[in-house]
UniProtKB/Swiss-Prot annotation:
The keyword Transmembrane helix applies. Residues 343-360 are cytoplasmic. The chain crosses the membrane at residues 322-342. Glycans are attached at residues 187, 194, 206, 293. Residues 33-321 are extracellular. It holds the Pfam family Thioredoxin. Acts as a positive regulator of ciliary hedgehog signaling. Involved in ciliogenesis. This is Thioredoxin domain-containing protein 15. Keywords: Cell membrane, Cell projection, Ciliopathy, Cilium biogenesis/degradation, Disease variant, Glycoprotein, Meckel syndrome, Membrane, Signal, Transmembrane, Transmembrane helix. The keyword Glycoprotein applies.
């Protein structure tokens, strides 16, 4: 029993030794996990400054290319400019372009100049490289103002151009009209052509005098509303001729001069049509402007539409008359429908008889 008791302490010691080895082996993974977590935490803390550190390294390598002798000095100057020595400047470096970095640059002494080489030269290179983006960003608004003009300025510039074009068109008339001799003439009225009269008989093909011709119809309300204004034109322009004709009675002339709708106003020089009035607002003032722009002849002042112009010679009220062409068209259409109906009924009666004869 004594030897067994004497052997127990070495066995216990061996068990304790193996237990310590086992604990040490099992503790390695746990310690590795702790080291990994600690390294990951440190890496995450240092991650925000990573782009700036890479940029600083890049700038340091660029300086080494320019100045191989001053590697350590350039690195120190770069760290001093970037503010990597103090922990309070990390937020400044995170906003390099706007804000605090500009304040930091402005707070530095302005007496530092960029010399040709040395420590000051490397510092200037680092600063210029770091804040080149800031300088470029400051020039973007200037470029935008240079290439893009404001709408108000563009409109104000276009207005004088339009005015100049109008003045040029007014100074140089498109149609050179020979003014007629009005000596001894007191009554200036509009002449209306009847069905037997031809327009070419009133136009001089060998002359350069101008005539304003109106194509109208008495049943058109637009022609009736234009009539008083057109009746007053001979008094405003006594040097010109004014004619009016019923387009329904002179269909050949309407087709010849492209009258597809009434009222239609054409300006003739001799026997040649030169201009057409295309404005929807048909008043005395717009007609004056049209004639002046085309011929350069100014209208007489104080000429307005009077009560006599409402009466004639061109009627200003709708004339109700029978349109025989419309009556004939309706009669032909009704006759054709009746004839087609009768023929259809007779065909229906004939078809059963033909079938019966065919069976027999």
């Amino acid at each position: 029993m004594v030897p067994a008791a004497g052997r127990r302490p070495p066995r216990v010691m061996r068990l304790l030794g193996w237990w310590q080895v086992l604990l040490w082996v099992l503790g390695l993974p746990v310690r590795g996990v702790e080291v990994a977590e600690e390294s990951g935490r440190l890496w995450s803390e240092e991650q925000p400054a990573h782009p700036l550190q890479v940029g600083a390294v890049y700038l340091g390598e660029e300086e080494l290319l320019h100045d191989p002798m001053g590697q350590d000095r350039a690195a120190e100057e770069a760290n001093a400019v970037l503010g990597l020595d103090t922990q309070g400047d990390h937020m400044v470096m995170l906003s390099v372009i706007p804000g605090e970095a500009e304040d930091k640059v402005s707070s530095e002494p302005s007496g530092v100049t960029c010399g040709a080489g040395g420590a000051e030269d490397s510092r200037c290179n680092v600063r210029e490289s770091l804040f080149s983006l800031d300088g470029a960003g400051a020039h973007f608004p200037d470029r935008e103002e240079e290439y893009y003009t404001e709408p108000e300025v563009a409109e104000s510039d276009a207005a004088p151009t339009e005015d100049s074009n109008n003045t040029e068109s007014l100074k140089s008339p498109k149609v050179n009209c020979e003014e007629r001799n009005i000596t001894g003439l007191e009554n200036f009225t509009l002449k209306i052509l009847n069905m037997s009269q031809d327009l070419m008989d009133f136009l001089n093909p060998n002359g350069s005098d101008c005539t304003l011709v109106l194509f109208y119809t008495p049943w058109c309300r637009f022609s009736a509303s234009l009539a008083p204004h057109f009746n007053s034109l001979p008094r405003a322009f006594p040097a010109l001729h004014f004619l009016a004709l019923d387009a329904s009675q002179h269909s050949s002339l309407s087709t010849r001069f492209g009258t597809v709708a009434v009222p239609n106003i054409l300006l003739f020089q001799g026997a040649k049509p030169m201009a057409r009035f295309n404005h929807t607002d048909r008043t005395l003032e717009t007609l004056k402007i049209f004639i002046f722009n085309q011929t350069g002849i100014e209208a007489k002042k104080n000429v307005v539409v009077t009560q006599a112009d409402q009466i004639g010679p061109l009627p200003s009220t709708l004339i109700k008359s029978v349109d025989w062409l419309l009556v004939f068209s309706l009669f032909f259409l009704i006759s054709f429908i009746m004839y087609a109906t009768i023929r259809t009924e007779s065909i229906r009666w004939l078809i059963p008889g033909q079938e019966q004869e065919h069976v027999e």
